[in-house]
Regions:
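Active-site beta->alpha N-cap acidic-glycine motif
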Residues: 1-57, 61-62, 68, 137, ...
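Short aromatic-enriched loop/helix-cap "lid" or pocket-rim segments at secondary-structure transitions
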Residues: 18, 77-79, 164-165
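Terminal accessory/targeting
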Residues: 1-4, 13, 102, 113-167
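Alpha-helical scaffold elements lining the catalytic groove of polysaccharide deacetylases
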Residues: 36-57, 72-120, 132-138
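Short beta-strands and strand-loop turn motifs
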Residues: 31-33, 63-65, 92-94, 121-126
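A mature extracytoplasmic/lumenal domain signature
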Residues: 7-11, 33-35, 70-72, 94-97, ...
Length: 167
């Protein structure tokens, strides 16, 4: 199975070996912005450019997929247009797994209930907590048992076609 990993644009928070491993295992590297409606579009692009420079140095690949920490609704239409105009595809998690606040079992129950209640594409947001590794293993097992197709987010999969169309 492959996944998309949203790396913070603040590259000082990166574990270089982990970033290399993400790319080596065929996963998609993407970026996670920390922006609100007051963040200048040029500043967001500068952050993404710096992160891409570091990602390319470490892995030889650049990323054109981005998400905002607080969701694309926290961005203005103009900000989304700047990002889309620069060639980025915006993604929002459809479900926060809850692994930041809950133990793995509670987060698993919440996430599986969501999977069971929808037939659409589910983008699950996982955090970096003690519960995350166990939750990830349990979810991968569940997805396999249920025959749910899973794949990584790529530049060409359901891209944003306009600033008002974020996924």
């Amino acid at each position: 199975r492959q996944a998309a990993f949203f790396l913070p644009t603040d590259t000082s928070k990166w574990d270089d070996d982990l970033v290399r491993r993400i790319a080596a295992e065929g996963h998609t590297a993407a970026f996670l912005l920390q922006a609100d409606s007051k963040t200048d579009g040029a500043d967001m692009l500068a952050d993404l450019a710096a992160a891409n420079e570091r990602l390319t140095l470490l892995t030889g690949v650049a990323a054109r997929i981005a998400a905002n920490q607080s969701g694309s609704d926290a961005l203005t239409e103009a900000q989304r247009s700047v990002l889309i105009g620069a060639g980025y595809r915006l993604w929002d998690a459809g479900l926060d797994s809850g692994d930041a606040e809950k133990n793995a079992a509670e987060a698993y129950t919440q996430t599986v209930q969501y999977f069971a209640s929808t037939s659409g594409v589910v983008v699950v947001r996982l955090h970096h907590s003690k519960a995350t590794p166990r939750l990830t293993e349990a979810l991968c097992s569940y997805i396999g048992r249920q025959g749910i197709s899973a794949g990584r987010i790529t530049y060409s999969v359901a891209p944003v076609n306009s600033a008002s169309d974020t996924r």
